[in-house]
Amino acid sequence: MTTTQDKNSQAAITPDRALQLLEEGNRRFMAGRREERELMAQVDATRGGQWPFAIILGCIDSRVPSELIFDAGIGDLFNARVAGNFVNGDILGSMEFACELAGAKLVVVLGHTHCGAIKGACDGVKLGNLTGMLARLEPAVEATNSPQEAAARTSANGPFVREVTVRNVRMALSDIRERSEILETLERSGAIRIVGALYDVETGSVEFLD
């Protein structure tokens, strides 16, 4: 959308429409038909406040910039980013602010293919503060049952890494619902949707998960 979000336009967007806007934006991105925007005009329009329609929890990977892959403008999206797109108390608090206080209608946990953090967790990497961070991703590795051979459960196995990535997204969705009464209540009432997605760094496409 080329117009800048305001309070009224945000209020008119349903959770389903918010998801549709992201899907449409990704299709434009893939087709090379991004909408033209006067970014400085959007800066001016958002001086007094912001009314994003979604919050994206994504990885820090430089290949996955939410505003670009969803063809969104300034003021459209909240972004929370951490390597491996896992959920912790700070992320939950940010999501609660975005939805309960700032009116966002959609929560997206966005994983991506060839994720370095997921690969590190698959390989059991130990390095400084990275060790504790990757420990947050190990449950997704452990919950991925196939293959069972240890030699095949490494970053060298592309299908295994992809399955762990999807599993990690789904576990993050469960964490959100289980650990945030505010977000769970908003979703149950129909005020928001909470969905998972996977971005393909080779094609530019976003697959929303069931």
Language model feature labels by segment:
Residues 21-23, 54-58:
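Short, hydrophobic/glycine-enriched beta-strand segments
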Residues 57-59, 81, 108-112, 195-200:
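Short beta-strand segments
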Residues 53-55, 104-107:
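Short active-site oxyanion
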Residues 1-49, 75, 84-105, 116-210:
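Divalent-metal-activated hydrolytic enzyme cores
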Residues 61-63, 113-117:
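Gly/Ser/Thr-rich loops at beta-strand to alpha-helix junctions
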Residues 57-94:
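Active-site cofactor/substrate anionic-group-binding motifs, chiefly glycine-
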